[in-house]
Amino acid sequence: MSNAKELYDRWLAQPDLDDAIKAELVSVAGNDEAITDRFYRDLEFGTGGLRGVIGAGTNRMNLYTVRKATQGLADYLNATDLPKKVAIAHDSRHNGELFARETARVLAANGITAYMYPRLEPTPALSWAVRYLGCGAGVCVTASHNPAKYNGYKVYGADGCQITLEAAEKILAAIEKIDCFDGVRLVDYDKALADGSIVMIDDKCLNDFVQAVYDQRVGDGAGIDALKLVYTPLNGTGLECVNKLLQKLGVTHVTVVPEQEKPDGDFPTCPYPNPEIREAMQKGLELCDKVHPDLLLGTDPDCDRCGTAVPDGKGGYRLITGNEMGLILLDYICRTRLAQGTMPADPVAVTTIVSTDMATPVAKKYGVELRRTLTGFKFIGEQIGKLEAEGRADRYIFGFEESYGYLSGAHVRDKDAVNATLLVCEAAAWYAQQGKTLLDAIEALYKEFGYFRNALCSFAFEGESGMHTMQNLMKNLRANTPAEIAGYKVDSAVDYDTDGTGLPRANVLEYHLAGGHKLMVRPSGTEPKIKIYLSAVGESEAAADAVNAALAEAAAAMMKV
């Protein structure tokens, strides 16, 4: 507590402290727990950049922690041969524009040209801008699908991918040398705008991004203009780019969920604006009951994840999971490109270790090499980069992860919900031409390859004590490999935090169970949670789901919840 209290006192004593920060610090005076939580550590910087609760202190997202991180990024960039240009974007979250401007001010003060989108834009549009403008790095101010109290600071490399571990460690080393009050260079925003050290990204860049997505069309587009859609941007950034794309595709029957149409950092209709969660899609589902569309599409606040619902044949709508949509799109892309003669030689698809095992037989059917990476789309982007370095970026046909991230082209290096919108609409139209829905598509795949069913259990551990609990749980699991889980014998266990997996070391444990089932344990890289991924295979959906239900109970016991 003593160190936290010293930091608290130092912050409070700053002569020009931001009024909102000062008011918050004054409000917690004498509250040791509140002070400790704000100051017991620096907000962790890693390959995902920064992410945390907005507020006062070293363990919060605020203009001082953002400035400090940016000074570290600037010092890193100025020590390399990379272009001294950085692209910046932000989403609809609280303080998003403020943090983007502060980022630009620090970069400009360090001789680095800051290119800013003039309004909020999707994360994939930031990845695009980095490559399009020839930048040395990029920053996207976003906390993706986290609750409203969060914001974040994602850093991208010159390739448009989120930074590598090596780059993150170098930036962190630079950050750790900086005092957030005395060690940061700043310029006046308006002055920097006038002298050209801060530049607004023009509309051509964004329009060319939408065109690049449109150019990823796989089929001939037959029937796509007949599609009837309900769309929700979940009060985030997706509306502009998704609308532009749908217009290019000729999809004109679009109803936007009115309560979720405009950007709103409070996310008033859903506390957790994540299209993976039914609650976030509920307003869209209610609208579907009134207008009866062919598809419901929902994009998260920074428009890199896309959720979908389709008619269930019983008068309602069923949400398609991220794994299911990944399989539908993988199958659609493969069969269509083979039929049209556009499949490259030695095609490659990429997914992650926590995504469905069913992708393996689907890829094999079409002669596609399936590569698996660690969790995080940056690793999928890294695989595209490796193919590009070999002069064979064309080999990449599709990448997906179970958390609703998809990408079918090399135009960006992060998951892209605008690209996903294109693919889902194409696939839905193709099946509609045959009198089928995407639900029929996944059911046909289940019947062909078996019912691979997946589920996710998340266990939250808040605050300093929660972090220690998470560390101890992982330590105990490593020391005591279970003999069985939910009555299924553990045939083998893999610890990804060791050498020999063929992948970079990661804090992930994998248990292969009798019957072909699987359970994986992984602390989240962006939230104070441990995630447990369940995978079951059965002769029917009900049989596989029953196994996952038993595994979920066992997972809760493992977490002592």
Segments (PLM) and residue ranges:
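An N-terminal, well-structured beta->alpha segment
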Residues: 3-103, 110, 192-193, 198-226, ...
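Short acidic, glycine/serine/threonine-rich loops at helix termini
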Residues: 97-102, 127-131, 149-155, 176, ...
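Glycine-rich phosphate-binding loop plus the immediately following alpha-helix
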Residues: 156-186, 323-347, 351-362, 417
